[in-house]
């Protein structure tokens, strides 16, 4: 565990479950002070840990985000690390069958939500001597993803957003990187596989096997590995890394 994150003030979006909760736990274990938001009620998993607080916020709602950052300022007294983790899977289907409202919702959460949070975080991060933004993208932001066009489009946008921010904010010492997970073990990927199986008329086991077959390591990614990368990027050891799209995907060659 990286140990030089003690005292850092960290905001994790969508921190009540899955990857987000693992990030909350990892930062807290390293001695950081962590506030997380989630679309569910504020008092949730992780708030029993020392130095962890939470509130409700929908990152696609600018009013919610404004209230969130006011609370972060009040609770943490500033910000050193923003982890833009919030995201949704979006619809599964052929492009001609996708409801435009589902397209809009996917992009509103997955990329506009990151903009909403980053826009308010940057003035706070400029006051920090060790500032970092970690954006969650996806393997779908490096490869195409059949029948998941809204999701893939949103994650390609996250990578472009990340690289542009790194250039813009570098002069202020703010590092910006993206993590691109592959198939991460947990309820979300189970739902994705189930939806894909239904859309293709295949079994769940067939879809899962096909996904693993195109990765060299033939495995799902433990969410703790993503949390460890986020902590590293926020630490002194990661202080020379910016503008990168870092894949944690078991060496996936394609998405199926």
Residues covered by each model-derived region:
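Short C-terminal tail/terminal secondary-structure segment
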Residues: 4, 89-92, 143, 219, ...
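Conserved glycine-rich Rossmann-like NAD(P)H-binding loop of the short-chain dehydrogenase/reductase
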Residues: 30-45
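Substrate-binding pocket helix/loop in short-chain dehydrogenase/reductase
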Residues: 93-95, 99-107, 211
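Active-site helix of classical SDR
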Residues: 118, 154, 162
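Residue(s) in the substrate-gating loop at a strand-loop-helix junction
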Residues: 138
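Short, small/polar-rich loop/turn modules that mediate ligand/substrate recognition or access, typified
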Residues: 170, 175, 241-243
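C-terminal helical subdomain
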Residues: 178, 186, 202-237, 241, ...
């Amino acid at each position: 565990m990286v140990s030089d994150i003690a005292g850092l003030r960290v905001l994790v979006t969508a921190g009540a479950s899955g990857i987000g909760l693992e990030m909350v736990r990892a930062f807290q274990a390293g001695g950081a002070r962590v506030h997380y938001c989630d679309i569910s009620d504020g008092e949730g998993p992780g708030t029993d840990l020392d130095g962890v607080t939470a509130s409700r916020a929908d990152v696609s709602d600018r009013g919610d985000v404004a209230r969130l950052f006011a609370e972060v300022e009040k609770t943490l007294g500033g910000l050193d690390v923003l982890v833009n983790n919030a995201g949704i899977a979006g619809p599964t289907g052929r492009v001609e069958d996708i409801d435009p409202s589902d397209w809009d919702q996917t992009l509103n959460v997955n990329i506009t939500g990151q903009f909403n949070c980053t826009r308010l975080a940057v003035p706070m991060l400029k006051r920090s001597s060790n500032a970092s933004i970690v954006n969650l993208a996806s393997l779908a932001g490096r490869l195409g993803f059949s029948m998941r066009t809204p999701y893939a489009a949103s994650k390609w946008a996250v990578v472009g957003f990340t690289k542009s921010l790194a250039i813009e904010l570098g002069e202020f010492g703010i590092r910006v990187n993206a993590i691109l997970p592959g198939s991460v073990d947990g309820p979300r990927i189970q739902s994705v596989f189930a939806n894909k199986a239904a859309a293709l008329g295949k079994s769940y086991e067939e879809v899962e096997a096909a996904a693993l077959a195109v990765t060299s390591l033939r495995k799902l990614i433990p969410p703790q590995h993503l949390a460890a990368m986020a902590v590293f990027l926020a630490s002194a050891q990661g202080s020379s890394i910016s503008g990168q799209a870092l894949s944690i995907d078991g060496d996936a060659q394609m998405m199926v």
